[in-house]
Amino acid sequence: MKVLVIGGTGWVGHNIVLELAKRGHDPEIFTRRSEGHYHSAVACFPHITGNKLDEEKLTGIVIKGQYDAIIDSVPHPEPIRILSRLKDHYGRYLHCGSTGVYTPLQSRPADEKHPFATRV
């Protein structure tokens, strides 16, 4: 399975990339920086550098990639709106950044009473 991992050089994302590869899938990494926190652990996988909030860039990547799945490990709701318009160009979408339901944060740290982000 060809999988785009958004935030694939961060803590959650790089573990997803490694597990996908271990299970025989073909992960590609979409990241803001070429040298992320855990970049060396996933340096052997294809990388695309860019910001997932850049609608034109994200759209181009998704249309060109024709991914079986997109796994998003970065907590921000805007790409969900972008990707929902592109749903014919990929198989499944999984958002797995738990703080994303609370963005933008009104206070730090956020607790269980913090309001949720706008639903899409």
Briefly describe each language-model feature range:
Residues 3-25:
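N-terminal Rossmann NAD(P)H-binding glycine-rich loop of SDR-like oxidoreductase domains
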Residues 9-11, 52-53, 74-79:
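Short beta->alpha connector loops
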Residues 68-72, 94:
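N-terminal Rossmann-like NAD(P) cofactor-binding module of classical short-chain dehydrogenase/reductase
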Residues 2, 26-28, 91-92:
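Residues at the starts of beta-strands that form the adenosine-phosphate
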Residues 30-38, 51-52:
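N-terminal Rossmann-fold cofactor-binding loop
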Residues 35-44, 86:
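Short loop/helix-cap segments at secondary-structure boundaries that form the rim of catalytic
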Residues 82-120:
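Conserved Rossmann-fold NAD(P)-dependent oxidoreductase catalytic core, especially the SDR/UDP-sugar
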Residues 49-68, 78:
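Conserved Rossmann-fold cofactor-binding substructure of NAD(P)-dependent oxidoreductases
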